[in-house]
Amino acid sequence: VYADREAFESTYVPLAPEKIVIQNASIYDGDGGEFFETDVLVEDGKIIAIGKDLPFSNEFKVIDATGKWVTPGIIDIHSHMGVYPAPGVRTSSDGNEATSPVTADVWAEHSIWVQDPQYALALTGGVTAFHILPGSANLIGGRGVTVKNLQRVTINSMKFPDAPHSLKMACGENPKRVYGNRGQAPSTRMGNAAGYRKSWIQAEGYLRRLNEYEEKSDEAKELEYAPTRDLEMETLAGVL
């Protein structure tokens, strides 16, 4: 009830697999191995063989990788792709909900512009997935999302199926600068810590009330309302 992955569910559909042979590549295997002038056979979306002069049928699509590198897909674990798209203009710069130091109720995926041209640029550099987060203006900036680097019309069709939510928190200069400059808390690191403590204490209380209600009998539940839904507390209770 407090961190529902089914909300805004992924509609990702894998690309149709091809039979591919990549020839004469320089390869980093991601485990310390390096291979040169080497072939890679891919079938049903999986690497089935690596070696020199591999035999293959004429069903395979041939990619000449002479002078090029083949590596595992790079996963960008801290990205603002799509929430700060290019070109960087105010109308689409939606990575920080800098209206309160704690905005745990917002989700980065609701700001992502899927037409950000940086996706294609990143793909040319081998980046195949992103963990996209809100910015660091706030103590608690909201939920992050994991997406595949695909050309799609909606963010739901890019979302990595069953990937857990994450939570962006910023502990240093940015929150105290953003809010201190406005004459608000936090303006110091001790203000940062106090803001965190207050939020997590509130979340503990919210979670306790939820659990107490769920433990009641069906008869008792008919006599009282469930705790009032709070989107901010839902996220924090989900972390707890």
Predicted segments with their positions:
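Polyanionic/metal-chelating signatures
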Residues: 118, 123-240
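Solvent-exposed loop/turn segments at secondary-structure junctions
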Residues: 27, 48, 69-70, 79-82, ...
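Histidine-rich, glycine-flanked metal-binding segment
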Residues: 13, 18, 27, 31-71, ...
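N-terminal pre-domain segments of enzymes
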Residues: 1-17
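Structured core elements
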Residues: 21, 41, 76, 131, ...
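Soluble non-cytosolic domains of exported or imported proteins
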Residues: 16, 36, 57, 96-100, ...
